[in-house]
Amino acid sequence: MKTVGFLGVLFGFAALSIPCASAQNSDQVRRAEGGTRPTLISISIPPLLNAPFTATVNTVWTVRSGDGTSSTVKNHRTIARDSAGRIFQERRELTPDGDKQETAITQLEYSDPTMHQKYFCHPDGHVCELYDYSVSAFTVDPTNGASTSGVNGLKSEDLGHEVIEGLDTIGTRETTMIAPGTIGNDHALPAVREFWHSMQLGFNLVLNRTDPLSGNSIIRVTEIRLGEPDSHLFEPPEGFTVMDARKPAATSEK
């Protein structure tokens, strides 16, 4: 891949760039004019050592518009991690529920905790953005993914254990209340997040959200294959121009 300075091609890339903030989302659905724009938050894959796998993330998202109508979109995408903690993730467009066609890949992500680099690659423009990746790989999942009960009014409930895709998971249901007036509501509304977390893999295999703000979403990790993926899966594609957006190293004054 050819590496160039970030500013040198910034303006030429602006028309096709996907902001890094959207890297956590497959896509976004706008509400009716005058409403808010909900955001879909997917699962987070940590750089866990010695826990290699390949899997598919399936998402179904229902968003209610200001006029009371709702729309449902979906997609699926490939994720993988090797024993060194390197992570590969696809991002795909969302398509209306019922559409049988495979959606287009919008972004490819390559996270390397050893080199402390992360690439966001865009197939439509054959361009990759290179950023610092400050997260270091670790050997033990330090959390089951749950938030702290009582913080900001959050109520957390232990749902016990369940085997999903052959892996033991810990279930948690979290409920927060949306204050009156937040979205035109005259009384408090519950937002519920239920997830089943695999300590072996270090992330949620199931994530269900019921939220008046962002809509209802169902995320499932399926087709989990334990073991080392093909090493080529963690290499950014050949022939892409790389925009180096890393921060310059700090220099000490003498």
Locations of the language-model features?
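Boundary at the C-terminal end of the N-terminal hydrophobic targeting segment
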Residues: 19-25
